[in-house]
Design a protein with these regions (language model features):
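Sec/Tat signal peptide C-region and signal peptidase I cleavage site
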Residues: 20-24
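Histidine-/acidic-rich catalytic cores in large beta-rich domains
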Residues: 25-307
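Bacterial N-terminal signal peptides
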Residues: 7-19
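Positively charged n-region of N-terminal signal peptides that target proteins for export
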Residues: 1-5
Length: 307
C-alpha cells in the first residue's frame, strides 16, 4: 500500500498540475473561470491553465477588455494577459490591508482598506483617490473588518463586515441605510461564526452572501428574511470556509472553499434544489479566496458578474 502511494505521488509530480484530470471534467457542465487565492489563474473549460499570474490574490474580475483587475493585500493592479500592469493603486498609511477591487460603472475602481482608518475608496484611472468614506466594521481586528464590497446599480455600496455579523448598505456619502444580520438564530447565532464574506445584490432585489466559518451560503429578501440557504448538510461536508460565491445567469449558485489544498474539491455549483451540478478540484483552485465563472459550455456569462 505504501509503495503504491509513493508511486502515485511521484507520477503526479512528474506530469504536473497541467494534466491532472479534474472532477469538473466528469460532468456535462464545463466552465472556464478565474481563481483568486493562493494562486491567481484562468482555467479553461478543458481544465488547462490559460493564464497564471505571479502572486496570490484576494479579489478581482476579468474585465470586458480581457484585462484582469486584481486585489492583493497591499495593492490593486489591472494587468494584461501578458502580465503588463496598466493600472495600480497602493495601500495607504496607516492602514494595513486591501480586500476589494471592483471596476465601477463609471470606469473608476472601488477599493476597500482595512486598518485604523477602514474606508471605501473610489480611485480614478491615474491612481488618485477621488472619493472616500469611512466604514463601520465594529472591530479593531484589521483582517476581519471587511471583505468583498460591491457597488450597486443605485450607486450605493454593499459591504460585508465579518465580526459585525452584518452586511451593510451605504450611500455614496457613507450614510448607513440598511443592515442584514447574519447572526440570526435560524443560522445558529453567533456561535456558528457566520462571518459574511460576500455581499451580492441579485437582480430580484435579494442579497446573497457566503458565511465563511459558518460553512453556508444564504439569500436574504430586502427585509433581511432568509429565503434560501445551503449548508454542509446539503453537500456532504464539502464546504470548508465558504468564501467566494457567484450567482449565475441560469440561477445556479457557485461557492468556493478557502481551506482546501491539493486535489480537494474547492468550488461547487448547486441549483436551487441544492443539487451539486459541477465541481472543481483543480490544483490551481486550491485555497481559493474568490473566483469568477467566465463561460459555461462555451457561452460567456452575461453582464456584470454577480460575485
Amino acid at each position: 500500500m505504501i509503495n503504491r502511494h509513493i508511486t502515485l505521488f511521484v507520477t503526479l509530480a512528474i506530469i504536473g498540475w497541467q494534466s491532472i484530470p479534474s472532477i469538473a471534467q466528469e460532468t456535462s457542465i464545463k466552465h472556464s473561470y478565474l481563481v483568486l487565492g493562493h494562486k491567481t489563474a484562468i482555467i479553461g473549460e478543458d481544465e488547462q491553465p490559460k493564464w497564471v499570474y505571479k502572486d496570490g490574490s484576494r479579489d478581482g474580475f476579468v474585465l470586458p477588455t480581457g484585462n484582469i483587475l486584481l486585489a492583493f493585500a497591499d495593492r490593486v493592479e489591472e494587468v494584461t494577459r501578458e502580465s503588463q500592469v496598466v493600472f495600480s493603486y497602493k495601500l495607504s498609511s496607516p492602514n494595513k490591508e486591501i480586500s476589494t477591487a471592483q471596476r465601477l460603472y463609471n470606469g473608476n475602481t472601488l477599493v476597500t482598506e482595512l486598518g485604523s482608518q477602514p474606508r471605501l475608496l473610489e480611485v480614478a484611472a491615474d491612481g488618485k483617490v477621488i472619493h472616500e468614506f469611512p466604514l463601520l466594521p465594529e472591530t479593531d481586528n484589521v483582517h476581519l473588518q471587511t471583505r468583498m464590497a460591491r457597488q450597486l446599480r443605485s450607486g450605493n455600496f454593499l459591504v460585508p463586515h465579518l465580526l459585525a455579523f452584518a452586511i451593510k448598505e451605504y450611500t455614496p456619502d457613507g450614510k448607513l441605510v440598511q443592515t442584514y444580520k447574519t447572526d440570526l438564530e435560524d443560522l445558529g447565532g453567533r456561535p456558528a461564526e457566520n462571518w459574511p464574506f460576500t455581499a451580492i445584490r441579485l437582480d430580484n432585489g435579494n442579497t446573497l452572501t457566503s458565511l465563511t466559518h459558518g460553512n453556508k451560503a444564504v439569500e436574504f429578501d430586502p427585509a433581511g428574511n432568509i429565503v434560501w440557504k445551503i449548508t454542509n448538510e446539503d453537500v456532504n461536508g464539502l464546504f470548508s470556509d465558504t468564501c467566494g460565491a457567484q450567482r449565475l445567469a441560469n440561477g445556479n449558485t457557485v461557492i468556493g472553499s478557502h481551506h482546501t489544498s491539493g486535489d480537494m474539491v474547492s468550488i461547487i455549483e448547486v441549483n436551487r434544489d441544492k443539487k451539486i451540478v459541477w465541481k472543481s478540484n483543480h490544483p490551481l483552485a486550491a485555497g481559493v479566496h474568490h473566483f469568477q465563472i467566465l463561460t459555461t459550455n462555451g457561452k460567456a456569462e452575461p453582464g456584470m458578474p454577480l460575485k
